[in-house]
Structures are given as structure tokens and as C-alpha cells.
Regions:
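N-terminal "arm"/small-domain region of PLP-dependent enzymes with the aminotransferase-like
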Residues: 1-43, 54
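Conserved core of the PLP fold type I
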Residues: 35-176, 187-206
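Glycine-centered flexible beta-alpha turn that most often forms the glycine-rich phosphate-binding loop
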Residues: 183
Length: 264
């Protein structure tokens, strides 16, 4: 009998597409050639941003403007950039009451005050409970800054936030003037019989949602590629504190070539 470790969000090593990535590497090097002497820039390799946009369109029905996409070294770098640039020490951040330990560690490092919101293990974060918390803060003249949520296959419960709850969450964000950071790290590994509901980013009409995704869960954490999507002016605000001169163009080009041939 095989042992299966549920402690880390990693694909099965036996499914890693080594041969296809070797082919993608050859194509990427051939296409990039001498351009690899240049820095990729804050937004990252355009070919991978185009793939991110196309993959989002396949699932959500609308493309992402590639100038709103920034490639990062995994989704944790995305979260670090977003939270570091939108929050100040002492800010109140709302999260699901059970949440990924890496995000908690980052929020603690930034000296924020974390408030957990009740959720159930099927439909996700409870918007009624969230509203009660927000009304209580409002009565004390306290204003939370943002809510961090994992709507698809929430870690650790596996809950999928229903469409109704997603819409309520956006309404509450508008009413109480909150940002939403949508961590969609597990959205690509859905095996439920019905399609998962539309992303908060797609449903958002008031520029409150910043979308985060990763290639770690569908390809491999060692690839270290993720991305965030933010509309103006927040895309520039978030990238303002970025000093790495961009994520590896070579790694990005290899993954882009791979997914162009393997979008399904």
C-alpha cells in the first residue's frame, strides 16, 4: 500500500511531466536566445502572462488583461508584495478562522491584527458572521483593512465558497470599504462534478479584489512560479516595493511553452 502525505500541497511526483518539460525547455531557449541577457521587468515574461490570461478565460469565460498580471516566484511572493504594500502595522485583517499557516506567519510578521471569521466545511466563509463582526467594529469606530479568503478548496477545510456567498462577500466589502485578497491556489485542481463558481475577481465591479494564483499545485512547487492580478492603481502600488528585477524569464518561458501545448 502506498502512503499519501496530506500535509503539503504538492502534486504526485510520478505525474510530473518531465519529458514534455524537456521539450518545452528546448523551445523556450530557442525562442528567447540572447534576450535572456535582459532583466524580465516587474510584470514578468509576457508569454507566461498571456498563458495566465488564456487559462483564466477558459475557466471564467473572460480573459485577463495581461498588463494587470504580474509573475512572481510562487504565490507567497505575490501575497508578500500585496500585504506588505497595502497594510500598516496594527491594521486589522479578516481571514477564515482556519487558514493556511504561511499566510498567518506573513500577517504576524507584518504586525497586523488577525481576526478569524467562522466558516463551514462545505460552503466556506459565513457572510452573516462576517457582517456581525464588521458591524461590531463599526460600532467601535474601528475599520478593518482587508479580508483574505481562499474560495476554492479552502485550506484546510476543502470548502468551496458558494456563488451566493461570493456575491455577499463582495457586497460587504463595498459596504464596509474593504479590500479582498482572493487566494485561488487550488482553483485549478477541481474534480467536483459541477464547475466551481465564478471568481471574486470576475464578480467584482468596484476594484476591490486582488487575485492570486500559482503553478505550484498543478505543476510543482519547485518551479516557483505564481502571479497576482490587480487593476490600476493597485498594480503599481503593489509592485512599488519590488526589488528583485522580475521573476526568471527562462523558468517562465518554459512553463509558458508547456501550457501552450497542454492547456487541458
Amino acid at each position: 500500500m502506498n502512503d499519501f502525505a496530506f500535509t503539503g500541497g504538492r502534486p504526485d511526483p510520478d505525474t510530473f511531466p518531465t519529458e514534455k518539460l524537456i521539450e518545452a525547455s528546448a523551445k523556450a531557449l530557442q525562442n528567447l536566445g540572447g534576450n535572456l541577457v535582459n532583466y524580465p521587468g516587474d510584470n514578468g515574461y509576457q508569454g507566461l502572462r498571456e498563458v495566465c490570461s488564456l487559462r483564466f478565460e477558459r475557466r471564467e469565460g473572460v480573459p485577463l488583461p495581461i498588463d494587470q498580471i504580474s509573475i512572481t516566484s510562487g504565490s507567497m511572493q505575490s501575497l508578500d508584495l500585496i500585504l506588505r504594500n497595502l497594510l500598516e502595522p496594527g491594521d486589522i485583517v479578516l481571514t477564515e478562522e482556519l487558514v493556511y499557516s504561511g499566510t498567518l506567519g506573513l500577517l504576524r510578521h507584518l504586525k497586523t491584527n488577525i481576526v478569524g471569521v467562522p466558516l463551514d466545511y462545505v460552503e466556506g466563509l459565513d457572510p452573516d458572521a462576517l457582517e456581525e463582526i464588521l458591524i461590531d467594529f463599526q460600532g467601535k469606530n474601528i475599520k478593518p483593512k482587508l479580508i483574505y479568503v481562499t474560495p476554492n478548496h479552502q485550506n484546510p477545510t476543502g470548502a468551496i465558497l458558494t456563488l451566493e456567498r461570493r456575491k455577499r462577500l463582495i457586497e460587504l466589502a463595498e459596504t464596509f470599504d474593504l479590500f479582498i485578497v482572493e487566494d485561488d491556489c487550488y482553483g485549478d485542481i477541481d474534480f467536483t462534478p459541477e464547475p466551481i463558481p465564478s471568481s471574486l475577481f470576475k464578480l467584482d465591479q468596484s476594484n476591490r479584489v486582488i487575485y492570486v494564483a500559482t503553478f505550484s499545485k498543478i505543476l510543482g512547487a519547485g518551479v516557483r512560479l505564481g502571479y497576482f492580478v490587480a487593476k490600476s492603481p493597485y498594480d503599481k502600488i503593489i509592485s512599488n516595493d519590488r526589488w528583485d528585477l522580475g521573476t526568471s524569464a527562462l523558468s517562465s518561458a518554459i512553463v509558458a511553452e508547456f501550457f501552450r501545448d497542454n492547456l487541458d
